[in-house]
A protein has these predicted regions:
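C-terminal helical "tail/cap" subdomain of flavin- and related membrane-associated enzymes
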Residues: 5, 325-467
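Glycine-rich FAD pyrophosphate-binding loop
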Residues: 26-47
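Conserved hydrophobic helix-helix packing surfaces used for dimerization/oligomerization
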Residues: 9-11, 32, 295
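Conserved mid-domain beta->alpha element of the FAD-binding
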Residues: 14-27, 159-160, 194, 276-369, ...
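Conserved Walker B
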Residues: 38, 164, 301-302
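Conserved FAD-binding catalytic core of PHBH/FMO-like flavoproteins
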Residues: 116, 132-133, 138-282, 286-287, ...
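Conserved N-terminal helical subregion
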Residues: 2-8, 55-193, 443-452, 459, ...
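Conserved Rossmann-like nucleotide-cofactor binding loop
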Residues: 17, 40, 165
């Protein structure tokens, strides 16, 4: 093996993110082997059927050929469609430009496309291989097959891309607790999947039924079906507002008929469906740092977030693109200035971790904050007035202000920078709006905001480099 060039990468986990990373690394001429715990026939599902929502932040990290194929099989959603308690329906656009939309796609379709792309690029996928230990100094993983036989595999770099229940991460934390810290928190809300007939639904938006601390969400698919999920607390004092307070099929049916009367007729089996299985739990996993020696974590293995921003997969693809970019940069430097494979691997993962840990932690906080918006705020007239003000401010002064959702979903500004910018601008708008009729005084508030920033330039997406 040449000491001046990295030649091989071992990836544990052959899900969408692992396959995307493999394709990027193969473009650099690296030998890439992916080892997947599941058998090939079982696939690499995550255990739930949420559609994955891709935005330009994540899509831009994928090859153009993959993006084209995804658009042929996914659903373009340009707005929220809000179903209010009184039967009224309102819409909220996700952004202001043609590419300000979500691409909603079933996980299985995304998985198949990215796996095929990785194989065409020359990556090798080995199924039925469970990671049971790692050696970060040697970039090695101990794998066990279905017969119980085990063997070590090694590369110049070891990547843990094996999801929220990452064996790579857990092995590193167990062996080096002082060097890698991990927290795992289960939030109060859980989820349950519901079968709901499509009917005459608008296929161009994400359908939401916000009901305080609980809400129903339905994502249209191209085959005129819905991927539908109910989110609500798992337990609490008010029985009707929590999963634990719905002990029978009849109680569930009464709840849905009361809360979602406009679509209850499309939920023929909702009572039996929810009574026959427990709700799923939602967890937040934060890790710091994302690396140890010559091993590095990518995607949910490093940072599992709740699905309320739909940014988990986008953040994970950014991880992959960032790691691949840093590898390319440092390999070029080594070839021109000298160094070793070990130097490249350890420098790359250190810089990657420095950038991506801050972004991952910020997204976890932003995702929890968006739960309040989805379940309650979208119903509030005051919230809608504020959103209208922010949208108008952006239209008039895009150099000074961009709404939070657009920064999160449709730019490459790091999530932690988004958080800082939004906290500053929100504080200013809060002070300007206090005690005023926001709708009637919209123009005056915008003028005062612009005056405060006269002669300055607020941090905007074009001025911040992505990690």
């Amino acid at each position: 093996m040449s000491e001046l060039a990295m030649r091989s990468v071992v990836i544990i986990g052959a899900g969408p993110v692992g396959c995307a990373l493999a394709t990027l690394l193969r473009r650099q001429g690296l030998a890439v082997d992916l080892f997947e715990r599941q058998t090939e026939s079982a696939g690499t599902g995550s255990g739930h059927s949420f559609n994955l929502t891709l935005t330009s932040r994540g899509l831009d990290c994928l090859p153009l050929s993959v993006r084209r194929r995804l658009y042929l099989q996914g659903s373009v959603l340009a707005k929220r469609i809000i179903h209010h308690r009184d039967g009224a329906i309102s819409t909220q656009a996700y952004g202001t430009l043609y590419n300000h939309h979500l691409l909603s796609i079933p996980r299985g379709i995304l998985q198949d496309l990215l796996r095929d792309q990785a194989l065409r690029a020359g990556a090798r996928i080995h199924y039925g291989q469970e990671c049971i230990d790692v050696d970060t100094a040697r970039a090695s993983a101990l794998l066990q097959d279905r017969d119980g036989s085990s063997t070590w595999v090694s590369g110049d770099l070891l990547v843990g891309c094996d999801g929220a229940n990452s064996a790579v991460r857990d092995a590193i934390v167990a062996a080096h607790p002082a060097d890698m810290r991990m927290t795992r928190d289960t939030i109060a809300h859980g989820y349950a999947e519901i079968t709901m007939d499509y009917g005459d639904a608008d296929p161009t938006g994400m359908h939401l039924w916000p009901r305080g601390d609980h809400f129903l969400q339905a994502q249209p698919n191209r085959d005129q079906t819905f991927t539908t999920s109910l989110f609500k607390p798992t337990a609490g004092d008010d029985a009707q507002r929590h999963f634990s307070g719905l002990p029978s099929a009849s109680a569930i049916s009464r709840y849905c008929a009361t809360e979602f009367p406009d679509v209850f007729g499309r939920m023929a089996e909702v009572g039996n469906e929810l009574a026959s299985r427990s709700p799923g739990y939602l967890r937040i996993i934060n890790t710091a740092p994302y690396h140890h020696r010559r091993a590095v974590l990518v995607g949910d293995a490093a940072h599992a977030v709740v699905p309320f921003y739909g940014q988990g997969i986008n953040c994970s693809f950014e991880d992959a693109a960032t790691l691949a970019s840093l590898l390319e940069k440092f390999q070029a430097a080594v070839r021109s200035e000298g160094g070793t494979v070990k130097t490249v691997a350890e420098v790359v993962v250190d810089e990657y971790s420095d950038v991506r840990v801050k972004a991952g932690h910020a997204l976890a906080e932003l995702s929890m904050r968006n739960l309040e918006e989805l379940s309650d705020h979208v119903n509030s007239p005051l919230f809608l007035e504020r959103k209208a003000l922010e949208r108008r401010l952006h239209e008039l002064r895009p150099d000074l202000y961009t709404p939070l959702y657009q920064l999160v979903a449709f730019t490459h500004m790091p999530y932690d920078a988004v958080q800082r910018v939004q906290q500053e601008s929100s504080a200013v708008l809060d002070s300007l709006c206090e005690g005023r009729d926001v709708r009637a005084e919209q123009d005056a508030i915008i003028g005062e905001f612009a005056e405060l920033y006269r002669g300055t330039t607020q941090l905007t997406p074009s001025k911040v480099q992505t990690g």
